[in-house]
Amino acid sequence: MTYALFLLSVILVMGFVGFSSKPSPIYGGLVLIISGAVGCAVILNCGGGYMGLVVFLVYLGGMMVVFGYTTAMAIEEYPEAWGSGAEVLVSVLVGLVMEVGLVLWVKECDGVVVAVNFNSVGSWMIYEGEGSGLIREDPIGAGALYDYGRWLVVVTGWTLFVGVYVVIEIARGN
């Protein structure tokens, strides 16, 4: 499990390197979607099944609509890929080399003090399987949000709708 969490973290950082190089809006949106899915897998790996599912549905359901509209409005005939320009390719390669170098340095050097010990990720876990508890905390929190914070949910939904409308209008040029 520790290696899976470490691998997911490396993939997440490499996704952010791919997004920060910004070759084209199409590829940037694709890398954000992949990074969001990997981030949800990290949450699932730490035991937050409900929270990982909700984040996956909200992020990938809502943001893919926004990415679809903005990409359709800003589409290029020949989009620039990560290997098409020298500066974009160099920035991606520098980021990947730095990530791999950091991983190898932390793995090989015994004198490196790591702030997070990967052998004790139990304190990061949302739900550990030990004990006789039958009620998990994350669905109860979502139920309380929809029960006591119903107006907050309505305002948040309206704000997201207005945000999508504003992005579409700005991308269209009106």
UniProtKB/Swiss-Prot annotation:
Major place of residence: mitochondrion
Membrane topology qualifier: Multi-pass membrane protein
Entry EC number(s): 7.1.1.2
Keyword Lipid biosynthesis carried by entry: no
InterPro entries with a match to the protein in the record: ComplexI_Subunit6, NADH_UbQ/plastoQ_OxRdtase_su6
Membrane-spanning residues: 1-21, 24-44, 47-67, 86-106, 111-131, 151-171
Tagged with keyword Ubl conjugation: no
Substrates-to-products reaction catalysed: a ubiquinone + NADH + 5 H(+)(in) = a ubiquinol + NAD(+) + 4 H(+)(out)
GO molecular function: NADH dehydrogenase (ubiquinone) activity
Intracellular or extracellular location(s): Mitochondrion inner membrane
Top-level enzyme category: translocase
Gene Ontology cellular component annotations, sorted alphabetically: mitochondrial inner membrane
Function: Core subunit of the mitochondrial membrane respiratory chain NADH dehydrogenase (Complex I) which catalyzes electron transfer from NADH through the respiratory chain, using ubiquinone as an electron acceptor. Essential for the catalytic activity and assembly of complex I.
Name used for this protein in its record: NADH-ubiquinone oxidoreductase chain 6
Organism encoding this protein: Pongo pygmaeus
